[in-house]
A protein has these predicted regions:
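Short, small-residue-biased leader/transition segments that mark boundaries at the very start
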Residues: 1-8, 199-202
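Conserved Radical SAM active-site core
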Residues: 97-197, 201
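Flexible, acidic/Gly-rich N-terminal and inter-domain linker regions that tether
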Residues: 5-110
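Short linear Ser/Thr-Pro motifs
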Residues: 1-2, 81-82, 115-116
């Protein structure tokens, strides 16, 4: 729809760190303490629309609406395996590409496998993604939003993150590291680094 495409032209708030929210508040001419409020809304609360940010002035909400959206991804579909041990999530990116995340329900933990690229440049014979070739790197927001939207959908804590979905994390290193830091931030999602892993294939650079 035209409304959906309009949203994709806006810059997502998810993916920004506290310094970037501070810069945004400066650009919009509002007090710096609003940056912490925005950060908390994005990563500690499950919000889908800017009108849900109740402690922010309406003037700021209006300014944000003109150039920003909350989520960079759209959840297209989610399916459960017959045993309910796995959930598969299909997302649409801001460029219109489709990516997947897989949730694994185990006895003492819930692990989400997150994609880091659309397609992959490596030709691993065991991997179906290799047949796509490399399309694009996911943004920090698109990496993080897989976690946030999956958590919202299943309505229970996700204890572990593995960057083992579509793509090679090492080839999108900067965005993956920034996403991991935001996942770990004690003022936000607060997921221990012990529970965040980045399996990688050998890469010649």
């Amino acid at each position: 729809s035209s409304a959906a495409s309009d949203v994709y032209k806006r810059q997502s708030l998810i993916g920004k760190n506290l310094d970037e929210f501070s810069d945004l508040c400066s650009e919009l001419g509002v007090e710096d303490f609003r940056s912490k409020q925005l950060f908390n809304w994005m990563y500690r609360n499950e919000v889908s629309d800017l009108t849900e940010l109740k402690n922010l002035p309406k003037s700021l909400i209006g300014d944000l609406k003109r150039g920003h959206c909350i989520h960079p991804l759209e959840l297209i579909n989610s399916t459960n395996s017959s045993s309910e041990k796995t959930n598969k999530f299909l997302f649409k990116t801001q460029s219109g590409a489709l990516i997947e995340s897989v949730l694994m329900n185990e006895k003492n933990r819930v692990t989400l496998c997150i994609s880091t690229q659309v397609g992959c440049a490596l030709d691993c014979k065991f991997c179906a993604t290799a047949k796509m070739g490399f399309k694009e790197n996911l943004s920090v927001g698109e990496i993080l939003d897989q976690y946030l939207l999956a958590r919202q959908k299943i309505n229970k804590p996700i204890t572990n993150i593995v960057f083992m979905g579509m793509g090679e994390p090492f080839l999108n290193y900067k965005n993956v590291i920034k996403a991991a830091k935001l996942l770990n931030d004690p003022n936000g999602i607060n997921l221990s680094l012990i529970h965040i892993s980045e399996p990688t294939r050998p890469v010649m650079i």
